[in-house]
Amino acid sequence: MSLVAIGINHKTATVDLREKVAFAPDRIHDAMKSLASCTQSGEAVIISTCNRTELYCNNSEAADVVAWLEDYHQLSHEDVEPCLYQYKGQEAVKHLMRVSAGLDSLILGEPQILGQVKQSFVKAKEAGTVAATMDRMFQNTFSVAKKIRTETEIGAAAVSVAFAAVSMAKHIFSSLSTTQVLLVGAGETIELVARHLKDNGVKAMVVANRTISRAEAMCDEFGATAITLEQIPDFLPKADIVISSTASPLPILGKGMVEKALKQRRHQPMLLVDIAVPRDIEAEVADLDDAFLYTVDDLQSIIEQNMASRREAAEQAELIAEDQAYQFMEWIRSLESVDSIREYRTQSMAIKDELVERAVNKLAQGGNSEQVLLELANKLTNKLIHAPTQALTAASRQGDLNSLGQLRAVLGLDKD
């Protein structure tokens, strides 16, 4: 038995099956306690996201963990088994490190997964299903994920449209904290853009949307101002950056509207990023002297270049994960040796205490001290060499030269 990781992810299973094996947030506490009861160590952590469900256990058989998963979700082995992956020992540790660093994600190097793994670990601690071994494993994993992000370029280059749009703004403006941003739309992409902007210090954001209530809901989270699409001409002159992503069939920002805004800005430059398909901003806006217009195609070429850069960084990251997983297992093995040494010393001390007690009793009864000491020495010697003698004899009879050589080395018989 050893560390075990089993899972299903976006590479191995359809959305339909991933939904069936997912754990609801309000049930994961009890689920981890149930899973931990199937292990000898009582240690278990469940990671459940939209793209993966993974179970990590210590001192457990993989087959038992799989059976528990199938039973918990009332799924047949035939449905689950073909989509499962399993790792043991060092490979299980390495897999956790790869997952946490974003090396196994749908978007290579994405940082969100690390936060999700940390949340799962916290929930496991709250459930009481983490002890020394898995606590050390997860803490090491978080350090390794940080090391990978620090020592490689795995997360440096934008590989999502939203991130690429904000990265472009960072290249053009020396500091985003003093810029005013107009976001057009209030869907998932614009929400992600707003999150990236806030993370980069943007304080002044205006969100324009056809449905004002949706814009207001988003603004509550990011401290932005909500307006309708009809109000855009009033706010456009104040905008240093405009990022648009709506489902409108026709352009929302025309050349005339932008030209008028630029005049009011006294021709201070304006960055416009159109990530909508079809376009939200008329292509002719690019002809204006102080307007810098980029489309989703421009961003896509940047993303493709950055993906190549991330793949190179991933090769370095894989080496780090491999090395750190090996070092963690070295720590595990050192614990095993400590336990063995402690057990051997305890056994030897018990033999010594028993024989000394007998010798003391004989001396108390008037026994000859020299004879008692000689008997003690002989019996102690025989007791201590009994197990090694049996092992040497067995290795010789079986012709096991490898074991015989190791035993001689351990017993110091080959010293000059």
From Swiss-Prot:
Q: Which UniProt keywords apply?
A: NADP, Oxidoreductase, Porphyrin biosynthesis
The entry marks the following residues as binding substrate, namely: T49, C50, N51, R52, S105, E110, P111, Q112, Q116
Q: Can you state which reaction this protein catalyses?
A: (S)-4-amino-5-oxopentanoate + tRNA(Glu) + NADP(+) = L-glutamyl-tRNA(Glu) + NADPH + H(+)
Domain of life of the organism in this record?
Answer: Bacteria
- Provide the residue positions that the database annotates as binding NADP(+): G185, A186, G187, E188, T189, I190
Its Enzyme Commission number? 1.2.1.70
Q: What are its GO biological-process terms?
A: protoporphyrinogen IX biosynthetic process from glutamate
NCBIfam families (alphabetical): hemA (TIGR01035)
**Other observations noted:** During catalysis, the active site Cys acts as a nucleophile attacking the alpha-carbonyl group of tRNA-bound glutamate with the formation of a thioester intermediate between enzyme and glutamate, and the concomitant release of tRNA(Glu). The thioester intermediate is finally reduced by direct hydride transfer from NADPH, to form the product GSA.
Assembly notes:
Homodimer.
Q: What is known of its domains?
A: Possesses an unusual extended V-shaped dimeric structure with each monomer consisting of three distinct domains arranged along a curved 'spinal' alpha-helix. The N-terminal catalytic domain specifically recognizes the glutamate moiety of the substrate. The second domain is the NADPH-binding domain, and the third C-terminal domain is responsible for dimerization.
Q: Which family does it belong to?
A: Belongs to the glutamyl-tRNA reductase family.
Summary of the function given for this chain in its UniProt record: Catalyzes the NADPH-dependent reduction of glutamyl-tRNA(Glu) to glutamate 1-semialdehyde (GSA).
User: What's the protein name?
Assistant: Glutamyl-tRNA reductase
The species this protein belongs to is Shewanella halifaxensis (strain HAW-EB4)
Q: What is the lineage of its organism?
A: Bacteria, Pseudomonadati, Pseudomonadota, Gammaproteobacteria, Alteromonadales
This protein's encoding gene: hemA
